[in-house]
Amino acid sequence: MRTSTQIETASVLVGEEKAVEYVAKAGFDAWDFSMFAMCDYDWQLGAVRPTTHPLAGENYLAFARKLKQIGLDNGITCNQSHAPLPTSCPEIRSYFKRAIECTAEAGGKICIIHPDNDRSAAENAEMYLELLPFAKDCGVKIATENMWNWDDAKDESCFAACATSESFVEHIDAVNDPYLVACLDIGHAE
């Protein structure tokens, strides 16, 4: 069994390069290429802001290769990635193919693309089916992931796409392709 963790939390403080190195030094076998910085989403305004992050620029694949090499130099590999979010934003959806490309370039085998929390399995399947031919060409599987919504009035989590085992299976069955897999995020499951 291999253990991995995402680099997003550390990269906010020290950048992706050091984050990969620190994940290795912490004893993990692999790293999750967290690509949330590819798009700077303002949650209060509900809009994408301009960013100068390397993943948003024209040399994004060179940046992915650089991170891969840092991992290899430190004895770990990229096993998976997280595409930018939220999926409900059409402008962010336009970056999903870039995220799949970066996953392949970094050596990852799975790119996690969150379902749209408020869409049905059939509606989310349309998005995944549109991306699957490109993902297959890159040799990367797409993973859907268990999600949650928050009810401010009740101060508790409430239903979202893939929040239950039934919804998770419904999403996988709606696509019915071995290149769409499931990622159970235990941080989302609490």
Sequence positions of predicted segments:
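Acidic/histidine-rich catalytic cores of soluble enzymes
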Residues: R2, K18, W31, E130-E190
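N-terminal pre-domain/capping segments
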Residues: M1-K109, K136, D173, D177-V181
